[in-house]
């Protein structure tokens, strides 16, 4: 069930801010799917629609408790067209043998910050948290995730990927804490980033804090550019440079997209990412993935559907 402790949206003309506090309780033994979607023309949980260029910030705070043996799939879609600021705070508590699978797809925004806190309060808990962010112009996306392993035999895995274009910025801060009694813990954390211009910037900091030896844990991060050899190979097969860049970018994103369990949602997100890479969802003067400037040639399109490769 979803229990709303307060009004679902709080509006103040002076603050010009929408807030959406919610508490979600998943009963023992049940499995639920929850999709949070920000439309292209409005921020998440907007009380009013100010159009595609609204500057009103919004704040979302959600607390989720997953009871013994229960599970939750939680997906958040953040649209690209608004320069508004978004702040989301998600806190998840897992009881014995409970699990949660999360995926956050950020296709743009002014300044987006996603905070995720997961606490393993019972044995056998499992958490998978994935994220994808595509930023351009002067947009900024910050992802902060904290996972606490407080009980034995729990597992967690985080995979966040980002493509940062133009003068955009992205930050990833991941922290996994393994307490002294949390033996047989398995925890993995990865952050991968592609920079498409020399003005784009990424800060990444995956961090493990472990207080016992009976664990399997790893973490890592990468920041780089598209594979020039792969791009050249595609171009030698008659594919334009623009399309080759778009195809390689989509292939980079596909691992996160495929982690979405709901087939119809997975297909819809895949289509949105393709449109984003085509430049159909946003535009700017000189970015590499979303440029509609005629001097840079026609809009990108796929000669081949990369999802079929």
Where on the chain are the PLM-derived regions?
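Small/polar glycine-rich anion-binding or flexible loop at a beta-alpha turn
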Residues: 248-254, 273
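Conserved beta-strand/loop scaffold segments within soluble protein domains that form the structured core
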Residues: 17-232, 236-239, 260-309
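Short, Gly/Pro- and small/polar-rich lid/capping loops
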Residues: 1-25
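Short arginine-rich
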Residues: 252-262
């Amino acid at each position: 069930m979803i229990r709303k402790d307060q009004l679902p949206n709080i509006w103040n003309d002076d603050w010009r801010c929408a807030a959406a506090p919610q508490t979600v309780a998943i009963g023992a033994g049940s499995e639920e799917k929850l999709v949070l979607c920000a439309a292209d023309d409005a921020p998440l949980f907007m009380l009013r629609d100010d159009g595609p260029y609204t500057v009103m910030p919004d704040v979302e705070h959600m607390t989720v408790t997953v009871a013994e043996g229960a599970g939750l799939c939680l997906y958040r879609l953040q649209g690209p067209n608004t320069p508004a600021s978004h702040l989301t705070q998600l806190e998840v508590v897992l009881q014995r043998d409970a699990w949660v699978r999360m995926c956050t797809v950020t296709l743009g925004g002014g300044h987006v910050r996603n905070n995720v806190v997961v606490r393993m309060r019972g044995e056998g808990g499992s958490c998978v948290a994935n994220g994808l962010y595509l930023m351009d112009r002067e947009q900024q996306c910050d992802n902060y995730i904290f996972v606490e392993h407080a009980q034995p035999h729990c597992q967690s895995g985080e995979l966040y990927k980002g493509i940062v274009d133009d003068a955009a910025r992205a930050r990833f801060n991941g922290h996994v804490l393994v307490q002294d009694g949390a033996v047989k813990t398995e925890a993995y954390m990865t952050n991968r980033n592609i920079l498409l211009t020399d003005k784009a910037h990424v800060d990444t900091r995956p961090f493990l804090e472990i207080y016992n030896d009976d664990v399997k844990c790893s973490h890592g991060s990468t920041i780089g550019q598209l594979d020039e050899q792969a791009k050249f190979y595609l171009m030698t097969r008659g594919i334009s440079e623009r399309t080759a860049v778009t195809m390689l970018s989509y292939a980079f994103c596909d691992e996160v997209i495929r982690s979405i369990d709901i087939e119809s949602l997975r297909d819809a997100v895949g289509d949105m990412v393709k449109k984003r890479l085509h430049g159909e969802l946003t535009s700017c003067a000189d970015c590499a993935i979303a440029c509609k400037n005629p001097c840079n040639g026609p809009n990108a399109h796929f000669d081949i559907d990369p999802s079929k490769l």
